[in-house]
Amino acid sequence: MADPKKLYIKTYGCQMNVYDSERMAEAMGGEGYVQTDRAEDADMILLNTCHIREKAAEKVYSELGRFKPLKAEKPDLKIGVAGCVAQAEGAEIMRRQPLVDLVVGPQAYHRLPELTARAATGAKALDTDFPEEDKFDHLAARPKAKRGPTAFLTVQEGCDKFCAFCVVPYTRGAEVSRPAARVLTEARDLVERGVREITLLGQNVNAYHGHARGLAGLIWDLAEIDGLERIRFTTSHPNDMDDALIAAHGACDKLMPYLHLPVQSGSDRILKAMNRKHTAESYIRLIERIRAARPDILLSGDFIVGFPGETDQDFADTMALVEAVGYGQAYSFKYSARPGTPAAEKEDVPGEVADARLQTLQALLTRQQRAIQDAKVGTTARVLFEKPGRLPGQMVGKSEHLHAVHVAAPDAARGDLVRVRIAESSANSLRGVLIAA
């Protein structure tokens, strides 16, 4: 019997890309491929790319360049580029890096097996269409092999908001939601394979409309699945946090008290320039309503500093918003222009100014995060163990609030959900002690 062909996938960027890479690996598994952790051993290399951060495309071209010696050594090696850089760059990738055999966008990866077959004939294979049919209808059933206790599940893709800085509407397309019945089927399958926590994914997940009662309705249906202990969702837009979803945070025990709700800026002038379609005040009022429903919720956010036209006062407004809200986790970045977006045509804030503002903002966010973590010492938490720790007999898992917790638990296993007392806080994690059952 011939040895199976080997597939190496390198994943960049968001959780949705992680999910997409899993599905691509499964699709290629049906073609006889098994995954390998070493590009040197692969018969096919696939880069699943992200286009959000600065110079994303150039980083992909640089990575491809490192495969030139390997391609020369193994002429039958197939190299593909998938994801959002593939969508944005298209055939330009093959022009700049002729070693690339196939390019596939995020809405067409269900066609990966046929593109691979085309590439095997020596032809270049390209598919960056936004197909009419739902790609999920054309993916093979997920394998029944056991897996870890947590999983991502994409329920929504694309975005209709057209923020001035963002490429997502151009690389992922318009908002599309998967029908609730199909999401529930996949969720039940994941639970049967050992999953106890599911994170629902979407570029704008709370705009989900595949259920008659929106994302809240889907969450309540998921909560009925025996064996599914925890539900999370990300990423959300403030304008789509409706009353039903806020109420679910207060009433659904399986919905974890954690919410990633990007705001990007605390300045109304900059929010308008970003085309965010909300104000700082409306965001703060929304946070108050969410906290009224779930007082212990941990909030996470995204911030961009140095957006074109940002003044010292605009930045001060952002700092004031952060002080008012109090974030347990946040992601902050210096603005970098994305080609093809409206903001790319505007004059940038000087780099040294943006750098200084970012440093100031991150210092505040770090203080807030550390204060919230320190306040957990002496409290109890339920921790879902995901993997062994670095120390003998240690397990690592996540609390309800998505904090990493290290626990001495020599008799525990992945997937155990245990009560612990938080004994110590460090910069990026907590240490817990098992509470006897």
UniProtKB/Swiss-Prot annotation:
GO terms for molecular function: 4 iron, 4 sulfur cluster binding; metal ion binding; N6-isopentenyladenosine methylthiotransferase activity. InterPro entries: Elp3/MiaA/NifB-like_rSAM (IPR006638), Methylthiotransferase (IPR005839), Methylthiotransferase_CS (IPR020612), Methylthiotransferase_N (IPR013848), Methylthiotransferase_N_sf (IPR038135), MiaB_methiolase (IPR006463), rSAM (IPR007197), rSAM_horseshoe (IPR023404). Coiled coil: none annotated. PROSITE patterns: MTTASE_N, MTTASE_RADICAL, RADICAL_SAM, TRAM. Residues 5-121 form the MTTase N-terminal domain. It is an enzyme of class 2 (transferase). Belongs to the methylthiotransferase family. MiaB subfamily. Catalyzes the methylthiolation of N6-(dimethylallyl)adenosine (i(6)A), leading to the formation of 2-methylthio-N6-(dimethylallyl)adenosine (ms(2)i(6)A) at position 37 in tRNAs that read codons beginning with uridine. Monomer. This is tRNA-2-methylthio-N(6)-dimethylallyladenosine synthase. It comes from Dinoroseobacter shibae (strain DSM 16493 / NCIMB 14021 / DFL 12). The lineage of its organism: Bacteria, Pseudomonadati, Pseudomonadota, Alphaproteobacteria, Rhodobacterales.
